[in-house]
Swiss-Prot record:
This is tRNA pseudouridine synthase D. Coiled coil: none annotated. One of its GO terms (biological process) is tRNA pseudouridine synthesis. The active site is at residue 80. GO terms for molecular function: RNA binding; tRNA pseudouridine(13) synthase activity. It comes from Haemophilus influenzae (strain PittEE). Its EC number is 5.4.99.27. GO terms for cellular component: cytosol. PROSITE patterns: TRUD, UPF0024. Keywords: Isomerase, tRNA processing.
Length: 339
């Protein structure tokens, strides 16, 4: 699925090979909520370091230890299992003593901070993540250095990667079967997964089409552009001066976007409209599920992007906003295999 999508850097697949996540410590993720814990309130907040652990599994164990229902447990986002990850959990415990979490024991889990907070940490309440990644076996070369410089200066395609589609693209397959009336999906979580897979596939195909046409740094008629640093967007229609918008794009004041389809999707550039219309089979589902259309930046530029060649391979450090995938960046640099 992802292997069929075009590359932005050098317009060709990377020549360098590497191992990703050969060890958990090769993939370190630290969550950034964008706000501090209040220090008081009815929620116990726990900052946890996990090694080779599933987010939901750890959350369930924390809730059980505290004697509260799993429904009273919250977190901002799921993290990779085969990794070392740090993230916040919360447990709703109004009028209850904070448990002695020094007695909590679970292989691969270390509780770094215990405090209180006045609001539940909800899924999606995440600003971004810091990454520290070792690409084992990646050897220094001129080609790889060019790719590193390109990603640092121009960014990478903001593709959704394999996690979004399920094992062997199962979620996308099921979304299509659902849309074609072959199956009924009663489970709410499965409906959400399948809808997300369909929207992600169409987004990826629009990005791929723009790369293929050399239109990743060009404002086209009817493009929908986003103000940098915000979630506000507007349409580059006949009321807008395309030349002026092009200058703003080059100054990074605005960003090009691609669609996350929904029941109220707007017509956009010809490139985008063609892809969306080819997947109209999903339109009834979007209306049925009252899915709101949204926009997502076409390209993403990592903040604080740095690299160093070590004995074991290439180490990358960078920050990405919530919703962008580190593996989408990595695939622009190396042909990686996951252990």
């Amino acid at each position: 699925m992802l292997e069929q999508l075009p590359y932005l850097a050098l317009k060709t697949p990377p020549k360098t090979t590497a191992l990703l996540k050969a060890e958990c410590a090769d993939f370190i993720v630290k969550e950034h909520l964008g706000y501090e814990m209040s220090g008081d309130g009815e929620f116990v907040a726990l900052y946890v370091r996990k090694t080779d652990c599933n987010t939901l599994f750890v959350g369930e164990k924390l809730a059980k230890f505290a004697g509260v229902s799993e429904r009273n447990m919250g977190y901002a986002g799921l993290k990779d299992r085969r990794a070392v990850t740090e993230q916040w959990f919360c447990l709703q415990m109004p009028g209850m003593e904070t448990p002695d979490f020094s007695q909590f024991e679970l292989d691969g889990v270390e509780i770094l901070t215990v405090t209180r907070h006045n609001r539940k940490i909800r899924t999606g309440s995440l600003e971004g993540n810091y990454f520290d990644i070792l690409l084992r076996g990646a050897e220094e070369s001129d080609e790889l250095k060019v790719r590193l410089d390109f990603v640092a200066n121009f960014g990478f395609p903001n593709y959704f990667t394999e996690q979004r589609f399920g094992r062997e693209g199962h979620n996308l397959t099921q979304a299509l079967r659902w849309a074609q009336g072959e199956i009924k999906v009663k489970d709410r979580k499965k409906r959400s997964f399948y809808l997300s897979a369909a929207r992600s596939e169409i987004f990826n195909l629009v990005v791929a089409a723009r790369i293929a046409k050399g239109a990743t740094n060009q404002v086209l008629p009817n493009d929908i552009v986003q103000l940098a640093g915000s979630h506000s967007w507007f349409k580059a229609d006949e009321k807008e001066d395309l030349n002026a918008l092009q200058v703003r794009l080059e100054n990074q004041d605005i960003l090009l976007t691609a669609p996350l389809i929904g029941e109220d999707i707007l017509a956009a550039s010809d490139i985008e409209n063609e892809i969306v219309n080819q997947h109209s089979v999903f339109d009834p589902l979007m209306k049925q599920e009252r899915m709101k259309a949204a926009r997502r930046p076409l390209l993403m530029k990592a903040k604080g992007f740095s690299w160093a060649f070590e004995l074991e391979g290439l180490r990358l450090k960078f920050y990405l906003p919530a919703g962008s995938y580190a593996t989408a960046l990595v695939r622009e640099l190396v042909n990686y295999t996951e252990e």
